[in-house]
């Protein structure tokens, strides 16, 4: 989508890189536009999910009773870490049979999706231009974003899945009647007439709590990855300011390399940390669904 008339080249560059490959061929006009399908987010998220499945399958196939290799040892270390966290948070052993593998999958999946942000900003656009697939507006890959977790739909979709699991385990453990009763009687417990007076307030607080957990879980991941992606674009603009072998261009070029390297190293921590936080909160929220107020 072209930038508004009179916009600077820098603004046009950023606006172009923030538009998804979708079914309408341009940027969404509003945040919630349910007729829009972002093909790039679907492709890269599914591809990273399949890669997680393949890596876990490969580790299971190569598993031996003897001294594990580096790859097997690395996977076993991650599995043990996630399993330990699941045991300490979700006390129901039967629930952990599903929740622990889910947490492991979510953790690795988000790591791989986040790691796509470490690819050079203009790597794929350059490839699309050279192949003629994205040289100008109207080409099939003129718009293409590689980072699924910087698309609000992906983190919010995952957080919605966690919310549904909270409802599922809440109803399963407490039974439908107990779950509904808790919505109206907690966190302010009372008896008699007072319980009837407090029931609407309890329901409202519980609904707000569920909504806040779901929204904050998705927005935290989205916000951090979107900001990281935007910073990489701003750093890339330093390199794009090259005008020849002069003092200003050389200084900007050095700044581009240094800033890009420092931010990439720091961003590795963000990639891992955001995946860990999402996994831990998934376990915490599902664990809380097993407990009463």
UniProtKB/Swiss-Prot annotation:
Any single Gene Ontology cellular-component annotation: plasma membrane
Protein family (similarity comment): Belongs to the ATPase A chain family.
Domain of life: Bacteria
Topology term for the membrane: Multi-pass membrane protein
Family annotation (NCBIfam families): ATP_synt_6_or_A, PRK05815.1-1
Protein name per the record: ATP synthase subunit a
Protein species of origin: Bordetella pertussis (strain Tohama I / ATCC BAA-589 / NCTC 13251)
Keywords attached to this entry: ATP synthesis, Cell inner membrane, Cell membrane, CF(0), Hydrogen ion transport, Ion transport, Membrane, Transmembrane, Transmembrane helix, Transport
Summary of the function given for this chain in its UniProt record: Key component of the proton channel; it plays a direct role in the translocation of protons across the membrane.
GO biological processes: proton motive force-driven plasma membrane ATP synthesis
Major place of residence: membrane
InterPro entries: ATP_syn_F0_a_bact/chloroplast (IPR045082), ATP_synth_F0_asu (IPR000568), ATP_synth_F0_asu_AS (IPR023011), F0_ATP_A_sf (IPR035908)
């Amino acid at each position: 989508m072209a930038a508004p008339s009179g916009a600077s080249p820098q603004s046009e560059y950023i606006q172009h890189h923030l538009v998804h490959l979708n079914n309408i061929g341009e940027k969404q006009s509003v945040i919630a536009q349910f007729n829009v399908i972002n093909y790039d987010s679907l492709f890269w998220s599914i591809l990273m999910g399949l890669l997680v499945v393949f890596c876990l399958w490969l580790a299971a196939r190569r598993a031996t009773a003897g001294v594990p290799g580096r790859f097997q040892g690395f996977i076993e270390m991650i599995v043990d870490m996630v399993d330990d966290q699941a045991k300490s948070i979700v006390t129901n052993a039967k629930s952990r049979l599903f929740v622990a593998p889910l947490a492991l999958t979510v953790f690795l999946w988000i790591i791989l999706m986040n790691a796509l942000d470490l690819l050079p900003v203009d790597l794929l656009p350059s490839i699309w231009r050279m192949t003629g697939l994205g040289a100008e507006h109207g080409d099939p890959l003129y718009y293409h974003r590689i980072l699924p977790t910087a698309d609000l739909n992906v983190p919010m979709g995952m957080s919605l899945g966690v919310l549904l699991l909270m409802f599922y385990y809440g109803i399963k453990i407490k039974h439908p009647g107990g779950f509904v009763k808790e919505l109206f009687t907690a966190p302010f417990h009372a008896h008699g007439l007072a319980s009837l007076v407090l029931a609407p307030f309890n329901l409202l607080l519980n609904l707000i709590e569920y909504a806040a957990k779901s929204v904050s879980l998705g927005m935290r991941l989205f916000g951090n990855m979107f900001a990281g992606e935007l910073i990489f674009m701003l750093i890339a603009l330093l390199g794009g300011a090259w005008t020849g072998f002069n003092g200003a261009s050389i200084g900007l070029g050095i700044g581009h390399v240094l800033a890009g390297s420092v931010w990439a190293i720091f961003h590795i921590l963000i990639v891992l940390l955001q995946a860990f936080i999402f996994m831990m909160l998934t376990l915490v929220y599902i664990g809380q669904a097993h407990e009463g107020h």
